[in-house]
From Swiss-Prot:
Keyword Transport belongs to the record: yes
Primary role: Mitochondrial membrane ATP synthase (F(1)F(0) ATP synthase or Complex V) produces ATP from ADP in the presence of a proton gradient across the membrane which is generated by electron transport complexes of the respiratory chain. F-type ATPases consist of two structural domains, F(1) - containing the extramembraneous catalytic core, and F(0) - containing the membrane proton channel, linked together by a central stalk and a peripheral stalk. During catalysis, ATP synthesis in the catalytic domain of F(1) is coupled via a rotary mechanism of the central stalk subunits to proton translocation.
Name of the protein described by the UniProt record: ATP synthase subunit 4, mitochondrial
Annotated keywords: CF(0), Hydrogen ion transport, Ion transport, Membrane, Mitochondrion, Mitochondrion inner membrane, Transit peptide, Transport
Origin organism lineage: Eukaryota, Fungi, Dikarya, Ascomycota, Taphrinomycotina
Organism: Schizosaccharomyces pombe (strain 972 / ATCC 24843)
Transit peptide per record: 1-36
Length: 244
């Protein structure tokens, strides 16, 4: 009873149509003259296109499998209705309407989802392409930087030879400085020895002079030396007077 009330409240057009079909007399007029019907009236989908849409909506991959699924489903439904296993009632109408609404929303949502997924995929693809381009440009810049250092080996070798020559010259300069310092030290030692020898000689000469003077004074102070010197002086005077 509740399902009937829900059906009457939710689908008044369905209830009205069923009532008109059951109660009201048929007002359709029949004519014996042949009438030509338009198979594709305006505003309606052709049967072949509708069949193609139904077949394409079946979840399968091949056309044969889709046709088999539809055939088996229709046969099972007809068998269930004919055997009384399944009875069409208000609940069936509600379920069918719900499934129809779900199908409509699914179709509309599929389009929106496809658009959203396409935009998302395009956005992610753009981000990945931009990252790829940035990575490619970074690699190219690095390759250019490395290419500019192709002559680094020759420059390094030249710097190595220069540093080696500089080290050799510094060693020679240090050796010369040591030699100059040694020569200065030897000169200072020799100068000190010369000065010492000069002092020693001066002292020896002074001692010799003092010794000679002492000896002379000692000889001069003797009586004999004075007498000999006086006699020699007198002899020299006599020689001078004789020659004059």
């Amino acid at each position: 009873m509740s399902s009937k009330l829900f059906c009457l409240r939710s689908f008044p057009s369905v209830q009205r149509t069923a009532w008109q079909r059951l109660v009201l007399p048929s007002t359709r007029k029949f004519s014996l003259t042949p009438t030509t019907f338009d198979k594709t009236p305006s505003g309606r989908i052709p049967p072949d296109q509708k069949a193609a849409n139904i077949i394409s909506s079946v979840p399968s991959t091949s056309l044969l499998t889709k046709s088999g699924v539809l055939t088996v489903t229709a046969a099972a439904l007809a068998t269930a209705i004919s055997k009384g296993i399944y009875v069409v009632n208000d609940e069936s109408i509600v379920v069918a309407s719900f499934l129809g609404l779900v199908g409509v929303f699914g179709t509309l949502g599929r389009k929106a989802y496809n658009e959203w997924s396409d935009k998302t995929i395009a956005k992610i693809g753009g981000i990945m392409q931009a990252a790829r381009n940035d990575h490619t440009s970074a690699i190219r810049e690095r390759i250019d930087q490395v290419a500019s250092l192709q002559e680094v080996e020759s420059v390094t070798q030249a710097l190595f030879h220069t540093s080696k020559e500089t080290a050799r010259m510094e060693a020679e300069i240090f050796e010369l400085e040591q030699r100059v310092a040694l020569a200065k030290e030897a000169k200072s030692v020799l100068d000190s020895w010369v000065h010492h020898e000069a002092n020693v000689r001066a002292e020896q000469q002074e001692r010799l002079v003092e010794d000679v003077l002492a000896r002379v004074n000692s000889k001069v102070s003797t009586q004999k030396f004075q007498q000999d010197a006086l006699n020699e002086s007198l002899g020299e005077i006599e020689k001078v007077l004789a020659s004059a």
